[in-house]
Amino acid sequence: MNLGDTIVAIASAVVPNQGSIGIVRLSGAAALPIARQLFQDPGQQTWESHRILYGYVRHPQTQTIVDEALLLLMLAPRSFTAEDVVEFHCHGGIIPVQQVLQLCLGAGARLATPGEFTLRAFLNGRIDLTQAESVAELVGAKSPQSAQVALAGIQGKLAQPIQQLRGQCLDILAEVEARIDFEDDLPPLDEPQIQRDLTQVLEKVAQILQTSDRGELLRTGLKVAIVGRPNVGKSSLLNAWSRSDRAIVTDLPGTTRDVVESQLVVQGIPVQVLDTAGIRDTEDAVEKIGVARSLAASQQADLILFTIDAAVGWTAADQEIFQRIVATKANQPLILILNKIDIGQPEAIEIPPQVQGVVKTAAAQHQGVDELETAIANLVQAGKVGAADLDFAINQRQAAALAQAQQALIQVRETIAQGLPLDFWTIDLRSAIQALGEITGEGVTESVLDRIFSRFCIGK
């Protein structure tokens, strides 16, 4: 990859016969000369930065008009990449956009690799690595809340505390190295104060690390399994919740033989709902497989909706299934669903301590769905499941680097407590500083950059 090349790519989604506008983006030193070759400006408008020009895209040899278009000019350094950037806004659809792309390639541009526009923005110092990663997360956001967290990352709300922590570590290192280099000219280090400073940094590191799991939930979604014995209304609950007929519903126990999935958004949180086969002892070979998959789904879920028939109450079979689920995954959040309340109200039920919420539903009548969503949202907000309100969230790469910094800082404290020489302090302090720098992109290796930006789409 030659970063001195001028690159080009389609920057809009290409949907056959459906797109209204197609965008072809150029970035690099030759972006403006290439645009001048291809774009005819009938109004002789001034080619200044941050202006929109109206005209035609012409073939440079035949002068054939390829498309009527708008041209956006964003010259360095006031552009996304901090290079000269030009965008052709063409008519949508595959043919016009591909024709403009081919003309740009023929005029000397190179096809951009995935994420290369954002990579150039990073390498040119316009954004740091956390902001670059947040761009990809915003594009792939599955809910308004995950989009908001990604946008916070783009605005630097993650980079700021990381840079502050790195600065604090650099200050401590400077104090230590000054005592090494000028031992006779400076007073001894205030070791208790250094320990207090390290404790403060570690507390902030721990707070940021806590956002990792919740951020991952926003990115991938909350996995919710509807579990219970046969014919308690699990499939009816899925259909009512998803407002569709995803699952087959009959009065016959054992109708659902496999896990049925549906994708929903609950108060900004993406949710993958799993309707599982009714759990019971059976001789039916196919149903046995379904039961096994139900138990597996319950273990993988972030939250279980344990469903019983309210008209019948809590039965011995319900108790047996509940114990099997609790035994396989301790401390798993559960909501008890009392379904079929339109048929009969349950007698007093002793709620097991593992249950963290009770919701009454009449799934066949589409009743209780709003209450269920509120109960799930309350668990999330309380931090018992996944993602409470987040100002920002770190991803897995960032969490791994932050954990390295945390371990190095803990080692510094132990080194001080053991009374080891100051040279030993600096080793782990430098490790912590390096790990924190990797989060924002300082000193990050080329292989890490390749891995990060390969996940981007071409044109971003």
Curated annotation (Swiss-Prot):
- What cofactor is needed? K(+)
The molecular function GO annotations come to:
GTP binding; GTPase activity; metal ion binding
Where along the chain is K(+) bound? N231, T250, L252, T255
The answer to whether keyword Transmembrane applies is: no
Tell me the GO BP annotations in alphabetical order: tRNA methylation; tRNA wobble uridine modification
Q: Which InterPro entries match?
A: G_TrmE, GTP-bd, GTP-bd_TrmE_N, GTPase_MnmE, MnmE_dom2, MnmE_helical, P-loop_NTPase, Small_GTP-bd
Which residues does the annotation say bind Mg(2+)?
S235, T256
What are the alphabetically sorted keywords of the record?
A: Cytoplasm, GTP-binding, Hydrolase, Magnesium, Metal-binding, Nucleotide-binding, Potassium, tRNA processing
Which Gene Ontology terms of cellular component type are present?
Answer: cytosol
Per the annotation, how and in what number is the cofactor bound? Binds 1 potassium ion per subunit.
Q: Where does (6S)-5-formyl-5,6,7,8-tetrahydrofolate bind?
A: R25, E87, R126, K460
Any keyword Hydrolase? yes
Report the subcellular localization: Cytoplasm
User: Which EC numbers characterise this protein's activity in its record?
Assistant: 3.6.-.-
Which Gene3D superfamilies does its entry note?
Answer: P-loop containing nucleotide triphosphate hydrolases, Probable tRNA modification gtpase trme, domain 1, tRNA modification GTPase MnmE domain 2
- Give start and end of each TrmE-type G domain: 221-381
- At which positions is GTP bound? 231-236, 250-256, 275-278
- Family, per entry: Belongs to the TRAFAC class TrmE-Era-EngA-EngB-Septin-like GTPase superfamily. TrmE GTPase family.
The record's section on NCBIfam families has:
mnmE_trmE_thdF, PRK05291.1-3, small_GTP
Subunit? Homodimer. Heterotetramer of two MnmE and two MnmG subunits.
Instruction: Please describe what this protein does.
Output: Exhibits a very high intrinsic GTPase hydrolysis rate. Involved in the addition of a carboxymethylaminomethyl (cmnm) group at the wobble position (U34) of certain tRNAs, forming tRNA-cmnm(5)s(2)U34.
Q: Which PANTHER family match?
A: TRNA MODIFICATION GTPASE GTPBP3 (PTHR42714), TRNA MODIFICATION GTPASE GTPBP3, MITOCHONDRIAL (PTHR42714:SF2)
Q: What is this protein called?
A: tRNA modification GTPase MnmE
Task: List the gene name.
Answer: mnmE
